[in-house]
Amino acid sequence: MVLSVPVIALGATLGTATSILALCGVTCLCRHMHPKKGLLPRDQDPDLEKAKPSLLGSAQQFNVKKSTEPVQPRALLKFPDIYGPRPAVTAPEVINYADYSLRSTEEPTAPASPQPPNDSRLKRQVTEELFILPQNGVVEDVCVMETWNPEKAASWNQAPKLHYCLDYDCQKAELFVTRLEAVTSNHDGGCDCYVQGSVANRTGSVEAQTALKKRQLHTTWEEGLVLPLAEEELPTATLTLTLRTCDRFSRHSVAGELRLGLDGTSVPLGAAQWGELKTSAKEPSAGAGEVLLSISYLPAANRLLVVLIKAKNLHSNQSKELLGKDVSVKVTLKHQARKLKKKQTKRAKHKINPVWNEMIMFELPDDLLQASSVELEVLGQDDSGQSCALGHCSLGLHTSGSERSHWEEMLKNPRRQIAMWHQLHL
């Protein structure tokens, strides 16, 4: 029993040593058969590592050269190129002028820093001349005068003339006024003109007018006037042809009128002739004053808008007493002879030319618009507080002149404000 313990220990020691020697032999044999397989990556050839590309570096080699050049700061805001206007060189004085240039009154200053040679914007030079000055530096006034023409000056004082031709259709019972031409003076240039014709008989009167034409020395209308008239009323009827003008403020005035009898003796039918127009005495130059207003109609809302803007040259017997008092305008909406509604503007101080700038709105169906009208009455307040009329006017198809044309323009142009001046009547 005592002998067996040392034997066991000796066997274990020999077995361990044999195992270690066998392991070392196997390791040496593996290294001999595969000499490079067991090397770590860091033990491999460093040249091979340089030849292999990696994810972090590229196999190509770059050459970086460093140079020092001045860097110019770039402005955040770039201003566009500004060019001066090119003068129209047409005068012979300018064409024959040998030396002219744009001179600056400021002395040139030295640049703070040298500019780069490629900066064309900073080195750009202005080559266009903005102004052309004479050699002596004095600009002379140029005055263009027209040669005096006695014949042309005499035509300014001549009365306007109207060319016309009368025809009558017995089957239709209509009177035709054709070949309308007007010869007027040129001192009222810039206005429009039209011809208005009216026939008065025992039963009443009918009117018709042409379209607006630019007023010239010789104005011609391609259209004519058609006036209904019974044949038995020809001997007693009177035809009035009126030449009217309209300025840019839509103010209508009478340039002249011509009265003709239709009995067939004074004016033969079918013959064209000239007639001298006479100034009408029906419309005074001042009257009771004028009022400026605009009207418009909104079909979708069935609303009639009347804007009272201002008045001027208000005249009446009590004008001096009412000067400085309150003045207002009463607007009445009528359908035929029935008054539908009336409204009044605010009061303004009577200074001959009062200003309101106030809008009045009426509810009016579309089917009642044709037979409706608007009446305006300018009212002044005296010392006792009583209101007195300074003038009135009416707009509608039942009226004539500018009052009728204003209403017709409103019907033709819905949703559009149309302003006109109208004469006030006492």
From Swiss-Prot:
Vesicular side: 1-6
Cytoplasmic side: 30-426
KW Secreted (keyword) present: no
Free-text tissue specificity from the UniProt record: Expressed in brain, pancreas and kidney.
CC annotations in GO: axon; dense core granule; exocytic vesicle; intracellular membrane-bounded organelle; plasma membrane; synaptic vesicle membrane; transport vesicle
Keyword annotations from UniProtKB, A to Z: Membrane, Repeat, Transmembrane, Transmembrane helix
Coiled coil feature spans: none
Alphabetical list of Pfam families matching this protein: C2
Taxonomy, superkingdom: Eukaryota
Function: May be involved in transport vesicle docking to the plasma membrane.
Protein name: Synaptotagmin-13
Species, as recorded: Homo sapiens (Human)
